A protein has these predicted regions:
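Ser/Thr/Asn(+Pro)-rich, low-complexity disordered segments
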Residues: 21-440
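Bacterial Sec-dependent N-terminal signal peptides
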Residues: 1-24
């Protein structure tokens, strides 16, 4: 009898060991640079495909529930990034074109019936019902920044899915319905020369947050200027977005002149979110050359991490990137002026167009050297802090999406070409007296 128990225990242990080996994530080594980029994009795409909300197809806010988010919580801005990732997956033939178009059509049909406020969607939405989930006590209505990231993706999808067949025709038409229904001018709060971030039927303008530059919100003003149905005046850009105490900079940090924004440039997502679709190459106006702005912002962030003035463990030429992310004590927007030792892979990887060599060095370090701790079923985890021996268990839609999209923009310029091909965007940029190679 005793021998039997020992035999049973041995068999059980063998089974557990075999299961552990089977469940261990395969991480191939010695890949070419191209194959590594393929793998990272494809693996990260799983967040927006395998983990998409099963009812609506919207992108879930995060992969864990550390902050009390339920499985029904989806993010509107992250969904826009997810739409762009579906385009990448289609172009690279990870999913079929018809499958992708039908997936996006399901999403768009859901959005047409979901809560919206003067055409704008809430920050968070229940992915099963379409009802608003309050982001905070008074933020229970429209969020035009999140909505802008959604439109960034939807307009790219409209341009990409251009076949003359029932599914793609319907997809384009319904995207246009949503786009044309957005009342940008409402969000000037009765005609002020600035756009306001929030409005709620319960709380009105109580959030009282005018959107002023320079930060991640430039796309809001470009879209509001591009609307054919409810546009805003150019003065809203020039007197609202531009006229702030933190718009112009002009100082030099680590040998790089920063035209706009906070000292040190702020978190790196400032140079990602608006520029997933908006191509900064040759984009300039009377205030800045936006390629110079974004590249120098990235180089300042890189050089700060390499110099590592606070002596955090792990910082190096192949381990850099400060942005908003999860961290050991919550969530924080990291930058050279707010550094807590936490590196987010999305920061360096979404900077591929600006710093390809430095970003590739970081990618190889994250994957080959730290991959046993950072690599996961949805690509890289959100962040890590080697000084604290802390590694996130989470992934966030707004961090995973830019990795896929900006690597693709580095490789092919796909999303840039799609977004900049929109007649409305070209019209809006002309209204702002901007220069771009895309303008005819």
């Amino acid at each position: 009898m005793k021998h039997r128990y020992w035999l049973l225990a041995a068999i059980l242990c063998m089974g557990i060991s075999a299961a552990a080996q089977k469940n261990k994530l395969y991480r191939p080594m010695n890949l070419s640079d191209s194959a590594l980029l393929d793998l990272v994009q494809k693996q990260t795409f799983r967040y927006f495909w395998d983990f998409a909300h099963p009812v609506s197809g919207l992108s879930r806010e995060r992969s864990n529930e550390n902050f009390g988010y339920g499985n029904e919580t989806t993010t509107i801005g992250g969904t826009g990034f997810g739409v762009m990732s579906v385009i990448v997956a289609t172009e690279r033939k990870w999913i079929g074109r018809d499958t992708a178009a039908r997936f996006l059509l399901k999403m768009v049909n859901f959005l047409l019936k979901a809560d919206s406020y003067h055409g704008a969607f809430p920050h968070w939405m229940n992915g099963a019902t379409g009802k608003t989930i309050p982001f905070s006590r008074k933020d229970d209505g429209a969020d035009i920044v999140e909505t802008s990231y959604l439109f960034e993706g939807l307009l790219c999808a409209r341009q990409y899915f251009n076949a003359d067949n029932p599914v793609e025709n319907e997809l384009r038409n319904r995207i246009n319905w949503i786009w044309e229904g957005m009342e940008w001018n409402w969000f000037t709060k009765g005609g002020e020369e600035v756009l306001y971030w929030h409005w709620s039927p319960n709380n009105g303008w109580a959030m009282n947050f005018p959107i002023r530059g320079f930060n991640e919100c430039m796309i809001v003003y470009v879209l509001a200027m591009s609307s054919q149905s409810n546009p805003v005046s150019p003065n809203v850009f020039h007197r609202g977005w531009v006229q702030s105490s933190f718009f112009n900079n002009g100082k030099t940090f680590y040998g790089h002149k920063l035209p706009l924004g906070f000292d040190g440039g702020g978190p790196l997502f400032f140079s990602h979110y608006s520029f997933l679709g908006l191509d900064p190459h040759g984009l300039q106006d009377g205030y800045a050359n936006y390629w110079e702005q974004n590249r120098n912002h990235t180089l300042i962030n890189y050089d700060y991490c390499v110099s590592n003035p606070k002596k955090f463990k792990g910082y190096a030429a192949n381990c850099w990137g400060l942005t908003a992310c999860d961290t050991y004590d919550g969530y924080n927007a990291y930058s050279p002026t707010n550094d807590g030792g936490t590196i987010a892979p999305t920061a360096a990887l979404s900077a591929f167009p600006y710093t390809p060599d430095y970003s590739m060095a970081a990618l190889k370090h994250f994957y080959y050297d730290l991959g046993d701790k950072l690599w996961s079923e949805y690509g890289f985890i959100d962040a890590f802090n080697e000084s604290k021996n802390w590694y996130a268990s989470s992934h966030l839609a707004i961090d995973q999406g830019p990795i896929i999209v900006m690597i693709e923009n580095y490789r092919s310029g796909l999303l840039w070409k799609l977004f900049m091909s929109c007649p409305e965007i070209q019209y809006g940029l002309k209204r702002l007296d901007m220069q771009s190679p895309y303008l005819k």
